[in-house]
Swiss-Prot record:
Cell membrane found in the keyword field: no
Name of the protein: 5-formaminoimidazole-4-carboxamide-1-(beta)-D-ribofuranosyl 5'-monophosphate synthetase
GO molecular-function terms, A-Z: ATP binding; ligase activity, forming carbon-nitrogen bonds; magnesium ion binding
Source organism per UniProt: Methanosarcina acetivorans (strain ATCC 35395 / DSM 2834 / JCM 12185 / C2A)
Entry keyword Transcription: no
Binding site for ATP: 145-196, 226
Top EC class, one word: ligase
Amino acid sequence: MITKQQVLEFLKNYDLENITIATVCSHSSLQIFDGARKEGFRTLGICVGKPPKFYEAFPKAKPDEYLIVDSYSDIMNKVEELRKKNVIIIPHGSFVAYLGTENFAELTVPTFGNRAVLEWESDRDKEREWLLGAGIHMPGKIDDPRDINGPVMVKYDGAKGGKGFFVAKTYEEFDELVDRTQKYTIQEFITGTRYYLHYFYSPIRNEGYTLSEGSLELLSMDRRVESNADEIFRLGSPRELIEAGIRPTYVVTGNVPLVARESLLPLIFSLGERVVEESLGLFGGMIGAFCLETVFTDSLEIKVFEISARIVAGTNLYISGSPYADLIQEDLSTGRRIAQEIKEAVRTNQLDKIIS
């Protein structure tokens, strides 16, 4: 992985009065570009082949310029061009997935956030070590599929938008559905309501909900719309569907907004705080936007089944603010909050604390 010192050497040649915010044209890029523009930054969209036509329909979020590449791996050959434009990369889930975690770790362009989190986020065993070390309640993990004796969720490593995930109740069902060519994790299936909690950790702000270093914000929350799981039971009971050879799938197709009971906010903040504090000790901290993927049970317990250590697509619901972000600042999206962090770091000469 590129070292922090190498990144700081690149920054010495940057014109910090003319930073360009860049990301791949996908996932949450409209929100990122809109937020960057609101904070006065130039924007650059990276795309394969030609610029997406639909960007013309959203002039406020259309980037100021595009970098056209032959393939996403070709980004690695454009690093000097990006650095000449004083680019800071904003990674989102698709950026990392398309470029590949190894390439992303070696990308010689200053990047918002701490790339060291990749080692802990992309490996489900290390992710579990991190969350359990933070005192987070997680679904039980089953190491041997022959021990399955009730509903479990089987997930593959990496950001796949839920593709290929499945529920099994027996070893036989698991054996029928699993793709053994991929690394997988088997988790106890928790009944309850799914909440995806969108946080922002700043190592350079020391006001609001403060931690041992910096501060934590809760910007929004959502629930994912999954195909075909969210509509399939219109066709019949689970038993009838299985008899018909139809099984639920969990591909994310969109998001719906949520708020939580106000009495749950102390626990929600506590979860975010514990995860950040643990990250500070493990790898120097998880910087910027992150999401805890949770289930709220009927006993009002919150179980965390995964973490996404960057901006998530569910924040796209709130380009003009959310019920929580509006109580911090009107018209505050996660994309805009990222731009504010960069702007503040430049102003206070603290870019080294938020860039890797």
